[in-house]
Amino acid sequence: MGAKISEDHPPQGNGGPLSNDPCSAGGEPRGAHLSRDGDGSVGDKGGDDDDDDDEGVVGAVSLTEASDKKKKKKRKPKKKKAKKATHQSSPPRVPLSELFTPGQYPTGEFLEYEDTNTARTTAAELRALGRKQLEDPAFLDDYRRAAEVHRQVRQWAQESVKPGQTLRDIANGIEDGVRALLGNQGLEPGDGLKSGMGFPTGLCLNHETAHYTPNPGQKDVVLQYEDVMKVDFGVHINGWIVDSAFTMSFDPTYDNLLAAVKDATNSGIKVNAAIQEAMESYEVEIAGKTYPVKPVRNISAHNIQHYRIHGGKSIPFIKNSDQTKMEEGEVFAIETFGTTGRGRLYDDVGIYGYKLENGGPSPASLPFASAKKLHKVIKENFGNIVFCRRYLERLGQERYLAGLNCLVSNGLLEAYEPLADVKGSYSAQFEHTILLRESSKEILSRGSDY
């Protein structure tokens, strides 16, 4: 989820490194059929007598006696324990707790720092703070588990999403998969703070570049063969958010656009300064006309803090003189956006989502009871995690628009608008979450796909 850069305030941040390379998931039914034994045949050991004259009578008596004496009881079917799942289903519904032993979730890709990298400080006190977090096994386990959920769900999305589907169905499919793999539907107060979506699933088509998700009251948008769709979603466990994005297209016309942005993201993970050069080395031919791929200038990568998708530091991927440092123990979302348009985004119509703001007036001072009630629901279910109106309706909230507007106007909620380039242009996005270590970076969200 990109951080928009204000035109009035230059971005803070600088680049920090990672690399390319790659997850997979398949599906097979869970459990096993219970076998049932049939009833035994009654009187199968009839009498056998040497007296031929009485053979028929004796035989009849023997059958009767046998049926009286040897009535076989029906055997109760043996209950077999369901086999532990070894593969992910499709759509993904097997919780990761059934596929992995806690503490043994896959690690990300490790990439050593370049010798020439000066972006990180070596101040002892800052390094000590970062190291304390890195040594916490629960912190690493939460992040790696969230990353594995992201990998498995996005693999399913890449295999199953096709033209003709609505964006609403695609978003619901991704989010249902995330919640199922986490084993938490998030419907009770407080559940959403334990684990869930890190922010609403972004599904941006063509010139729409960031921060669009289908919401109630909007007309269904159907994915077309000619569309270029950015898929950006986050997974959090105990407030530690994995933020990763990819772009899908079905028409090979746009292959170079996707390749340019993927290359730029991988270059930025290694050395931030190389992002712009990598992206601008590509061109895209659309309908007989050649377009240069331009980096989007007023949106940036960012650090991630506990329960906060945008932690305050920005990483522009164009040349700049900013000297903000990336520190050991910090988590960053390294993302790039490329476009055939102007390379500068504007606020589009509508609202993507909302985030609860700290500070501001007390909810008790709000003029509407509905706003006070809604503030309580948001705080209990999302905290500082970005949410959207679809999520409120999933919790059973009704007639909430006036309350939302009241919270926004009183500074208790921040609203995010969709961001777009000029109409008729096409844009792409790739993004990974990285963890900075003392001597290397761990690309937490790296998979076999990107």
From Swiss-Prot:
Reactions that this protein is recorded to catalyse: Release of N-terminal amino acids, preferentially methionine, from peptides and arylamides
UniProt name for this protein: Methionine aminopeptidase 2-2
Organism of this sequence: Fusarium vanettenii (strain ATCC MYA-4622 / CBS 123669 / FGSC 9596 / NRRL 45880 / 77-13-4)
Gene3D superfamilies xrefs: Creatinase/methionine aminopeptidase superfamily, Winged helix-like DNA-binding domain superfamily/Winged helix DNA-binding domain
Stored Pfam families: Peptidase_M24 (PF00557)
Feature: compositional bias, Acidic residues: 47-56
Transmembrane annotation, as ranges: none
Binding site for a divalent metal cation 2: 243, 302, 335, 431
CDD domains named among the record's database cross-references: MetAP2
Sequence segments annotated as region (Disordered): 1-100
GO CC terms, sorted: cytoplasm
MF annotations from Gene Ontology: initiator methionyl aminopeptidase activity; metal ion binding; metalloaminopeptidase activity
Cofactor (UniProt): Co(2+); Zn(2+); Mn(2+); Fe(2+)
Species classification: Eukaryota, Fungi, Dikarya, Ascomycota, Pezizomycotina
Entry-linked NCBIfam families: met_pdase_II
InterPro entries, per database record: Creatinase/aminopeptidase-like, Met_Aminopeptidase_Type2, Pept_M24, Pept_M24_MAP, Pept_M24A_MAP2, Pept_M24A_MAP2_BS, WH-like_DNA-bd_sf, WH_DNA-bd_sf
Binding residues annotated for substrate, in chain numbering: 211, 310
Role this protein plays: Cotranslationally removes the N-terminal methionine from nascent proteins. The N-terminal methionine is often cleaved when the second residue in the primary sequence is small and uncharged (Met-Ala-, Cys, Gly, Pro, Ser, Thr, or Val).
List of residues binding a divalent metal cation 1: 232, 243, 431
EC code(s) of this entry: 3.4.11.18
